[in-house]
Amino acid sequence: MKPKTTYIAAAVGIGIIVLAIFYMYSADQAKNRGKIFGDNLQTIQDELKQIQVEFYSKKTMLEERTMTQEEFAEFSKIHIEKMKQILAKYDALLPPESFAKSVELFKLSTQKQLESDQYLMQWIATNDTSDKIRSDSLFQESFEDEMAALESYNKAKNSAGQN
């Protein structure tokens, strides 16, 4: 082999090695970004669950008369702010494209849950049955959106795992 051909072959070999390293690095980075996204989404969902458990616990306390309506109204203001903070956290997520739909559905579910809670608070304050009916309806829609979000998330996760 001529020296020039040897240099070209060596350069091509080095180029292939560099591309392989870059590909592996990119794949690792994508996997890391996916894990970070999944962890952040799980944290948001856990916070949301805790906020809702606390809200319904306070509602039970009100029903059992261990909390006054005024105390519940004050707590409700804090609850609404916490729910708005959760919604903002969805906006801050940077989901991989395949997970964008599930994040939209999780956020929509949370928005409907917030609306449901607000109608429930209104019903408690006014005893207007239409507020309770609207709250229940939004609660059901929120649940359905949550199930759709979970299904979408699992489909995207399974597709990503097969690649």
Locations of the language-model features?
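Transmembrane signal-anchor/signal-peptide helices with a preference for the extracytoplasmic
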Residues: V18-D39
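Hydrophobic membrane-insertion alpha-helices, especially the h-region
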Residues: Y7-Y23
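Intrinsically disordered, low-complexity segments enriched in small/polar residues
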Residues: T5, I21-Y23, E97, E104
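Alpha-helical segments in soluble extracytoplasmic regions
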Residues: I36-N163
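Short, low-complexity patches enriched in S/T/P/G
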Residues: M1-Y7
